[in-house]
Amino acid sequence: SDLQEYLELPEGFNPRTLQLAAELQRDPRNARANHAQWVDVAMQRLRSGGYRYTLEPGVFGQHSADEFWFDKKAGFCEHIASSFVILMRALNVPARIVTGYQGGERNSVDDFWTVRQSDAHAWAEVWLEGQGWQRIDPTSAVAPGRTGTLQRLTPPRGAITNAILGTVNPALALNLRA
């Protein structure tokens, strides 16, 4: 299947996260869980498990998802998104990490966009049957103020949205400043 690569996990890494997935799958309450329900289970864990957003989580080792889910319970968007994706894949939900920028400021005087490194963000996409790839922002479960709701990942129609969707005027790139 074309989705197989989005289920792959490196052998020997994050054994506690794999064990968590196995325990969730054995739980009778999850006996008929579909992909969307597994997303809900993971997001609920993030919301209620004492996880927090920080730009200074310390150094993670080779089992970074295990450290996030069980030890540190803290990280920034890359830690949260990658740990979420590893759990999704362990639950047999095709998932991938997406990185980009969320935000930016339009200068109305000269019509330039300023996108800063602080606007960088990482989130996840999961494959839902009949819907295709769906954006999920696990950081929003940990730090709603950092990212807002999932809907904020779908900006209002405009230059940046058009750029993301591939319908942008090529001249837009000339008006972006990093």
Feature-to-residue mapping (PLM):
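Acidic low-complexity segments
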Residues: 1-71
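Intrinsic-disorder/low-complexity, polar/charged segments
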Residues: 14, 34, 76, 171, ...
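Short capping/connector residues at structural and topological boundaries
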Residues: 58, 73-75, 106, 141
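Short, contiguous acidic/charged loop-to-helix segments that flank catalytic cores in large enzymes
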Residues: 67-76, 111-115
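Solvent-exposed, low-complexity, intrinsically disordered
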Residues: 68-71, 99, 178
